[in-house]
Amino acid sequence: MYDYIKGQLTKITAKYIVVEANGLGYMINVANPYSFTDSVNQLVTIYLHQVIREDAHLLFGFHTEDEKDVFLKLISVSGIGPTTALAIVAVDDNEGLVNAIDNSDIKYLMKFPKIGKKTAQQMVLDLAGKFVEAPQETGHTKARSNKAGNTQLDEAIEALLALGYKATELKKIRAFFEGTSETAEQYIKSALKLLMKG
């Protein structure tokens, strides 16, 4: 098992980042790959969780140990896999998540991709009271100069699809942001807020 990796961030895609350490490039699945844009070609520390399957060994990465802790609690719930847990972490609203779990707000929990009523109820059963203190949002969004709007929006939509959101939902998101000029990371964060509002 790995706790963290320290190395050079060499690549960002819609689904994962690549960190090079000791001559090896590690593919690491992350909640919002574009939140790492400012760190390309720089030394980074990524907190890790490894999932071993028959057909693959997967690494999931996080900005902070708090983010990793939320992820680990989520995948302990029956019906929630790593991809769904990443989609929940990507919303970056841990306080809202904890409040929803502790107050049995099933409707809020069902707004996450692939979370139906039964899984939402299971989240409440398994996790209520488990978050002693709601971790703060990671706050890793930084203001940057805007790049070409459409390309950035395309990348954001691709990343949201990778998190499990439906194309029909994202068609409305694309229409909402058409004509604006933001970074992919900013589009993702804004889109996730809109998706959670329903």
UniProtKB/Swiss-Prot annotation:
SUPFAM superfamilies registered for this protein in UniProt: DNA helicase RuvA subunit, C-terminal domain, Nucleic acid-binding proteins, RuvA domain 2-like
Top-rank taxon, per record: Bacteria
Region (Flexible linker), start-end ranges: 143-147
A molecular function (GO) term: four-way junction helicase activity
Domain comment quoted from the record: Has three domains with a flexible linker between the domains II and III and assumes an 'L' shape. Domain III is highly mobile and contacts RuvB.
Task of the protein: The RuvA-RuvB-RuvC complex processes Holliday junction (HJ) DNA during genetic recombination and DNA repair, while the RuvA-RuvB complex plays an important role in the rescue of blocked DNA replication forks via replication fork reversal (RFR). RuvA specifically binds to HJ cruciform DNA, conferring on it an open structure. The RuvB hexamer acts as an ATP-dependent pump, pulling dsDNA into and through the RuvAB complex. HJ branch migration allows RuvC to scan DNA until it finds its consensus sequence, where it cleaves and resolves the cruciform DNA.
Family: Belongs to the RuvA family.
Protein known as: Holliday junction branch migration complex subunit RuvA
